[in-house]
């Protein structure tokens, strides 16, 4: 039987498993690849292939993550699974594996546990938009009422963190039994895959979002004007369109009078491309690295925000000592460092290397930002932490 070849035309969706240690995240990941490969074609991945997660670096932080891929009839999924709790925290905060949706695994034998709560909170803070629940190990629970109780607890916990706990899908299954090929439990994996397809909307592609280009360099070309260079993060900029220069200084409007790539002139610059954009009426000294070029009105400059951060441990090349309130590091956004002060939550006196913490940050210059923007925390050019803007304040 010939397998159909992988079609690039299918929408691509990023998902991942989250949840408490030993609740079966990796077993479920293996079960999904195995059952879907058997049902729709594709390749299965064994538990130990997934559990042996390779190290990767994101924003100077080493994270162990496993990536698997699988297909449903309508979509192609890239799925991330992490072996340890600390890897999840780092992964979610750095955005190393951006998730369009997550599968929260809860063992029916235990119900929600401390890391279940922490992963849900992190999901809320870092902007995981959709959660589907897989209640695992249901083959080990005979009492229907107990299953009802666990499901209710999980739904209430999700609602407490502003997810639609009453409405989101919950699948009761057994990853291990599905992996062993028991039809009744394999059907639950197919049911879960159906919810991935129907409950997680197709993500908006970067190219369809409003134009944004983080400025890396500025040149002036005699007789032509000022050119800014950088990689288009999202959207499209066309010659003749109005753009705004946002961040650090007051916002200024200009017009794009040319786009070039590899010294060739283009009509437009698109998401993912490294381009030079020629700006009308802008002096070389009016614009600097760290600002962004954006579609007018699409992004505002801010100095104050609530954030979720991970502080590197000593072994990861981070600080050797804790820090306290009044700590003033640099916050590296996109292409530049900005000094900021921090405020710790009530009852938190100090932050140790290896901790993750919620903190309020006030920057000395405004930066173009939206909720979900990633940043690094640096001291003299050395990365000591990573963070994400949970909520813009001012």
UniProtKB/Swiss-Prot annotation:
Region called G2, residue ranges: 60-64
Start and end residues of each tr-type G domain: 10-204
InterPro entries: EF-Tu_GTP-bd, EF-Tu_GTPase, EFTu-like_2, EFTU_2, G_TR_CS, P-loop_NTPase, Small_GTP-bd, T_Tr_GTP-bd_dom
Residues given in the record as Mg(2+) binding sites: 26
Pfam families on file: GTP_EFTU, GTP_EFTU_D2, GTP_EFTU_D3
Chain spans, region G5: 174-176
Record flagged with keyword Nucleotide-binding: yes
Region ranges (G1): 19-26
Catalytic activity: GTP + H2O = GDP + phosphate + H(+)
Record keywords: Cytoplasm, Elongation factor, GTP-binding, Hydrolase, Magnesium, Metal-binding, Nucleotide-binding, Protein biosynthesis
Region (G3): 81-84
Broad class of the protein's primary localization: cytoplasm
UniProt-annotated binding residues for GTP: 19-26, 81-85, 136-139
EC number(s) given by UniProt: 3.6.5.3
Positions of region (G4): 136-139
One Gene Ontology term, aspect cellular component: cytosol
Protein location: Cytoplasm
GO molecular function terms attached to this record: GTP binding; GTPase activity; guanosine tetraphosphate binding; translation elongation factor activity
Family: Belongs to the TRAFAC class translation factor GTPase superfamily. Classic translation factor GTPase family. EF-Tu/EF-1A subfamily.
Subunit text: Monomer.
Record function comment: GTP hydrolase that promotes the GTP-dependent binding of aminoacyl-tRNA to the A-site of ribosomes during protein biosynthesis.
Protein name: Elongation factor Tu 1
């Amino acid at each position: 039987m010939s397998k159909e070849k992988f079609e690039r035309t299918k929408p691509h969706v990023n998902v991942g498993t989250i949840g408490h240690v030993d609740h079966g995240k990796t077993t479920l990941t293996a079960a999904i690849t195995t059952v879907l490969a058997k049902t729709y074609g594709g390749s299965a991945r064994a538990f130990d292939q997934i559990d042996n997660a390779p190290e990767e670096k994101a924003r100077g932080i080493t994270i162990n993550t496993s990536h698997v891929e699988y297909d449903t009839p309508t979509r192609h999924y890239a799925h991330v699974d992490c072996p340890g709790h600390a890897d999840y925290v780092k992964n979610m905060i750095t955005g190393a594996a951006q998730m369009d949706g997550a599968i929260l695994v809860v063992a029916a034998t235990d119900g929600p546990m401390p890391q279940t709560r922490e992963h849900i909170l992190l999901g809320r803070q870092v902007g995981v938009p959709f959660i589907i629940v897989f209640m695992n190990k249901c083959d080990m629970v005979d009492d229907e009422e107990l299953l009802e109780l666990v499901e209710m607890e999980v739904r209430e916990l999700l609602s407490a963190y502003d997810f639609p706990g009453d409405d989101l899908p919950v699948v009761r299954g057994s990853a291990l039994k599905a992996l062993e090929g028991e039809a009744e439990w394999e059907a639950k994996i197919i049911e879960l895959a159906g919810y991935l397809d129907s409950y997680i909307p197709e993500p908006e592609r970067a190219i369809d979002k409003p134009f944004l280009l983080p400025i890396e360099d500025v040149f002036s070309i005699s007789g032509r004007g000022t050119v800014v260079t950088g990689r288009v993060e999202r959207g499209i900029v066309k010659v003749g369109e109005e753009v705004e220069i946002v961040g650090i200084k007051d916002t200024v409007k200009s017009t794009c009078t040319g786009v070039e790539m590899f010294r060739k002139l283009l009509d437009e610059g698109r998401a993912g491309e490294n381009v030079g954009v020629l700006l009308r009426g802008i002096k070389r000294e009016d614009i600097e690295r760290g600002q962004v070029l954006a579609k007018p009105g699409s992004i505002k400059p801010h100095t104050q925000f609530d954030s979720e951060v991970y502080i590197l441990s000593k072994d990861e090349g981070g600080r050797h000592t804790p820090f306290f309130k009044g700590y003033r590091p640099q916050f590296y956004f996109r292409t530049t460092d900005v000094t900021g002060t921090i405020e710790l939550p009530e009852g938190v006196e100090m932050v140790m290397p290896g901790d993750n913490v919620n903190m309020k940050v006030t920057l000395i210059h405004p930066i173009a930002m939206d909720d979900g923007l990633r940043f690094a925390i640096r001291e003299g050019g050395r990365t000591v932490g990573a963070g994400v803007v949970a909520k813009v304040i001012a």
